[in-house]
Structure formats: structure tokens, C-alpha cells
Amino acid sequence: DQAGDPNLYAGGPCYVGIDIGRRKDLFVIWVFELVGDVLWTRQVIERRGASFAEQDQLLDEVFSRFRVMRCCMDQTGMGEKPVEDAQRRHGSTRVEGVLFTSPNKLTLATVGKQRFEDKGLRIPMGNQALRADLHKLQKVAGPTGAPRFVAESDAGGHADRAWACFLACNAAETGPIEYAYHPVPRKDTLRGNRRTL
């Protein structure tokens, strides 16, 4: 399978999801490339116990290697500062912080589940850790009866890979940011100066 190999990146728009973890849980960056209408996994970076400086460096490398249209990051708890720093470095229109509230987790899981059901994404074959993370997620009724997602934490993490994947799916939901510009004449042409080469 071609999913998960960054060397197969074809230059298309990319969408990134990041689950922040520092000590017990994993720090995971998930990169999807949009090819047609399918999100292909291009890279999954996992680190346990990575310093925030290393996490920043890994994210900067992703932004320099891939054409990142949008990045959704876990902003909950210790994620506040990494999100703020990433927005400062890469722009607040490209980096969005997502608080892991029950409604937001439900939205993320629903978007991810829909992508899987529609065969709209490709993940690396044989990634047992990811499959285990996906199976850790359970939809349960909250105290008010509203559905919410929970995941048991174990030595493999707290469904960190699944949340990073779902955050990347969420980043792709808005599609590329459209913009336009109007060129202005160069200063030297406004003054009537001619440039020679």
C-alpha cells in the first residue's frame, strides 16, 4: 500500500492533525495529502516524551516539506501554548486550535468515521497501533444522555493516533483557503524608470 510513505508526496494540498502529548501520552502529527477526493496518509510522526522544542521542530519540518493548507491541533490543557506558537509561526488562518470538549470530540469522531465509511481516506496497512487506537474509542451516553467519546489510556497511549487522524480529517473538511490578489506596479515603473537586464 502507498499510504504512509512521505516519499510518494506528489505536491498536492495537505491537511495536518496534531494530538499534543508530553509525558504519558504520545505526541502525534498526522499528514494527509488530498489526491482527487481521497485523503492519503503521507506521514505519521509519533514521539513519547518529546520536549516542546522538539515538537515545534517536527511541526516546522512538516510545514516546510508539505504544502499544508490547514492544521488542526489539540488545544486542550498543555496544548494552549503549542497552538499559539504554531499560529505565530505559520499563521492563524492555517493553524486552528481545537478544544477536546465532548461536542468537539463527537464532531471529530463523526467526521473521521464518515471518511472511513466512504473510503475517503487511506491509512498505512498493518499499522496495528492505529487500529488498536481506533478500537479504544467508545461512544457512550454522558450524564445528560448526550453521546460522547471516551478512550481508555494504556501503555500505547490514549487513542492519540486516532485523534491526530481525526483532527487531520477535520482540517480537510474546509478545503483549501481561496484567496486573490491584485498586482501593483513596481516602484521603478511608477517613476518612469526603465530597468535593463
Describe every region a protein language model picked out:
Residues 1-102, 106, 110, 114, ...:
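RNase H-like, metal-dependent nuclease domains and their acidic two-metal-ion catalytic environment used
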